[in-house]
Regions:
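Acidic/His-rich, metal-assisted hydrolase cores and their charged scaffolds
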Residues: 1-205
Length: 205
């Protein structure tokens, strides 16, 4: 992720990071702050966010010392963020890059901001879409990833009804940021709650 992001920014492109608004968005923003402090990406590269993730981020920061955290010193707003503008012309200006867009939805459903921005970036070889969640089958995020992987540069993709197909020239990569509890996490919850009965339910359908 670090390498791919740095490469997009180095060539003057914009990196689109589609995220789920609660949990993954805040995790990515904290990580971006760390990458800036480490010098992995430029300190002055702008980071843009939008929507309810900003309100949720405030709650994360306000409760960082009263809820269990790996590092209570990490703050979502510890890294400077700019609000994605509403105006179409202003959006075009910030896409001139370099920059980082952390917006929802993680699956890039239409008409979310992630979908709107992806349609404006997909034909630009300087830009990159970095997927940090599992793109479910049939979603725009999955269609974009499959097109880029299967057919390479110029492969057609339909990201929204009435728009496209568009040729994929931007970088598209997927990174495995797990949002699930591991075995020890699940066991510790059961041990703390000590319930009389535990029901295990899992399945896509």
């Amino acid at each position: 992720f670090r390498k791919a992001l740095a490469e997009v920014l180095a060539r003057g492109g914009t990196a689109l990071i589609p995220v789920f608004v609660m949990g993954r968005a805040q995790e990515i923003l904290v990580l971006l702050g760390q990458l800036k402090r480490e010098g992995a990406i430029p300190m002055d590269v702008p980071i843009y966010t939008a929507g309810s993730m900003r309100a949720i981020a405030e709650i994360y920061d306000d409760t960082r010392t009263t809820t269990p955290r790996v590092n209570p010193d990490d703050q979502v707003f510890g890294v400077e963020q700019h609000r994605v503008p509403y105006e179409a012309e202003a959006k075009r200006e910030i896409l001139d890059g370099p920059g980082i867009m952390v917006v929802s939805s993680g699956m890039m459903f239409e008409p979310t901001l992630a979908n709107v921005l992806a349609r404006r970036m997909v034909e630009n070889e300087e830009d990159g879409v970095l997927l940090v969640g599992h793109p479910a089958d049939g979603t725009p995020a999955r269609r974009l990833l499959d097109a880029a992987r299967a057919d390479g540069p110029g492969a057609p993709v339909m990201l929204a009804d009435g728009h496209g197909p568009q040729p994929v020239h931007c970088t598209v990569e997927r990174f495995r940021f797990s949002g699930h509890s591991d075995r020890q996490d699940l066991l510790s919850i059961v041990e703390r709650l000590a319930p009389e009965q535990v029901l295990l339910v899992h399945g896509v359908h």
